[in-house]
Design a protein with these regions (language model features):
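Terminal, low-structured helical/coil segments at or just beyond the last alpha-helical repeat
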Residues: 2-14, 192-228
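Hydrophobic face of amphipathic alpha-helices that form TPR/SEL1-like repeat modules
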Residues: 25-32, 57-66, 95-102, 131-138, ...
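Short, charge-rich amphipathic alpha-helical segments embedded
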Residues: 47-59
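Canonical positions in the second alpha-helix
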Residues: 14, 47-48, 82-84, 118-120, ...
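Short helix-capping/linker turns of helical repeat alpha-solenoids
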Residues: 20-21, 51-53, 66-68, 87-90, ...
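TPR alpha-solenoid repeat register
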Residues: 24, 56, 92, 128, ...
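Structural signature of tandem alpha-helical TPR/SEL1-like repeats
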Residues: 5-8, 34-44, 71-80, 107-116, ...
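N-terminal leader/linker segments that initiate helical-solenoid repeat arrays
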Residues: 1-31, 35-36
Length: 228
């Protein structure tokens, strides 16, 4: 697969990768990605994807979605995600669901997104449980029930998803259950990354409880440290 063949993922059947080669390419790709060497990362993901391994095909789709070493193109990303998802690979199912929910690269289809999130959750992707909670809370599809949102958020949090913890804590705070919210906020702050500290700081910004004020200060410190 290469940049000139965006449809290759949908045409080639999955094949058995050479032992260790795909893992090496994926590992090197991630290292390059972490170091900001996007062009090198793309080359590694592209090389790995030639095997047809769904993990590698998914990462090549991710590169096209995010613009890692290539022009950002969610439509091409959707082709690769679909190819990898056809084998039942959980992260490809999740990433494809994100595109359908946002209407990026494909026509927006919340119902299709919901089906894919369910499949991703069944494949062990905890983040999919959190998304099912959001879809239930906002009643994005007819099958979703707001009353089920806490169940999905709790399942996501128990499976280690930091956003599941944040959303579960948010529901507890809205219900006036500060004591129940604190463990989930603490778990999210201790294990989360990226925008999690900012989300927690915003969530508790107007709260007056001493425990939440202390948590807000800690979240703000972590945000500042991340910017250094």
């Amino acid at each position: 697969m290469n940049k000139s063949e965006p449809g290759a993922a949908s045409r080639r059947p999955l094949s058995t990768p050479l032992p260790g080669v795909v893992e090496t390419h994926l590992m090197l790709g991630q290292i390059h990605l972490d170091q900001g060497r996007m062009d090198d990362a793309f080359l590694m993901f592209e090389a790995a994807a030639r095997s047809g391994d769904p993990r590698a095909v998914n990462m090549l789709g991710r590169a096209h979605e995010r613009g890692w070493g290539t022009a950002r193109n969610p439509a091409i990303a959707a082709l690769y995600y679909t190819h990898a998802a056809d084998s039942g690979y959980g992260w490809a199912l999740f990433n494809l669901a994100d595109l359908y929910l946002a209407g990026q690269g494909v026509r927006a289809d919340p119902c299709r997104a919901h089906v894919l999130y369910v499949a991703a959750a069944r494949a062990g992707v905890a983040k999919a449980l959190n998304m099912l909670g959001i879809m239930a809370e906002q009643r994005m599809v007819q099958a979703a029930r707001p009353a089920n949102a806490p169940v999905f958020f709790h399942a996501a949090a128990m499976a280690g998803d930091c956003w599941g913890s944040v959303n579960l804590a948010r529901l507890h705070l809205a219900a006036g259950q500060t004591a129940q919210a604190m463990p989930w906020l603490r778990h999210a702050l201790d294990h989360g990354f990226g925008d999690v500290p900012a989300a927690i700081a915003t969530l508790v910004a107007t709260r007056t409880e001493p425990c939440l004020r202390a948590l807000a200060r800690e979240a703000t410190r972590r945000m500042a440290a991340a910017c250094r």
